[in-house]
From Swiss-Prot:
Protein family membership: Belongs to the short scorpion toxin superfamily. Potassium channel inhibitor family. Alpha-KTx 23 subfamily.
InterPro entries named in the record: Scorpion_toxin-like_sf, Scorpion_toxinS_K_inh
Modified-residue entries (Cysteine amide), positions: C36
Domain comment (free text): Has the CSalpha/beta fold, which comprises one or two short alpha helices connected to anti-parallel beta-sheets stabilized by three or four disulfide bonds.
Site (Basic residue of the functional dyad): K25
Site location (Aromatic residue of the functional dyad): Y34
UniProt GO molecular function: ion channel inhibitor activity; potassium channel regulator activity; toxin activity
One CC-aspect GO term: extracellular region
Record's keyword terms, sorted: Amidation, Disulfide bond, Ion channel impairing toxin, Neurotoxin, Potassium channel impairing toxin, Secreted, Toxin
Lineage of the species this protein comes from: Eukaryota, Metazoa, Ecdysozoa, Arthropoda, Chelicerata
The protein's name: Potassium channel toxin alpha-KTx 23.1
Species annotation: Vaejovis mexicanus smithi (Mexican scorpion)
Tissues with expression: Expressed by the venom gland.
Additional observations: Negative results: does not block hKv1.4/KCNA4, hKv1.5/KCNA5, rKv2.1/KCNB1, hBK, hERG, Nav1.5/SCN5A channels when assayed at a concentration of 10 nM.
Lineage: superkingdom: Eukaryota
């Protein structure tokens, strides 16, 4: 099964979404990377 990338997911603020994260992580509201 392929890992689903959540970078750019709606719960992340646009400025965080624009930055993105590596390794399939997503930006939280503090612009910190976390695993979904």
């Amino acid at each position: 099964a392929a890992a689903i990338s959540c970078v750019g997911s709606p719960e992340c603020p646009p400025k965080c979404r624009a930055q993105g994260c590596k390794n399939g992580k997503c930006m939280n509201r503090k612009c910190e990377c976390y695993y979904c």
